[in-house]
Amino acid sequence: MNAIKERKIVYTSGQIAERVRAMAAEIDAFYGDEPLVAVCVLKGAVFFFTDLVRAMRSENLELDFVRLSSYGKGTSSSRHVVFSKDVDCDITGKHVLIVEDVVDSGLSMQFLMRQFEARGARSLRLAALVDKNERREVDVRDRKSTRLNSS
């Protein structure tokens, strides 16, 4: 027999929407008129990404997408992360904002930041809807900045 666990609402949709708007304002203030590439980590972050970039006021915003895989055969997670889909644009010399739904172990974000850093991104910053610090295996920090999702 399957027992259904009682679910508890952690954040209401209104609270999430307000935080997304606040993050967008933070990002706008931080970058100003600087060109920015916002990279959505598919598939999980797509709705958060859409809401976030719609709330941003930047006119110098380029959108791109990546998809990462950290699973070997079956469903067990591995420490080996690979691209299933890479960005299409050249990020050399550009500010890059990675938008992720949940940062858990940090392995995927560490992989992505190292890849983008090696390609010469001017700066790398992370906007995450949920940051599960308690499950972190590796340190995930913005490059040349402080975290935008610290609230």
Segments and roles (model prediction):
Residues 1-147, 151:
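PRPP-associated nucleotide enzymes
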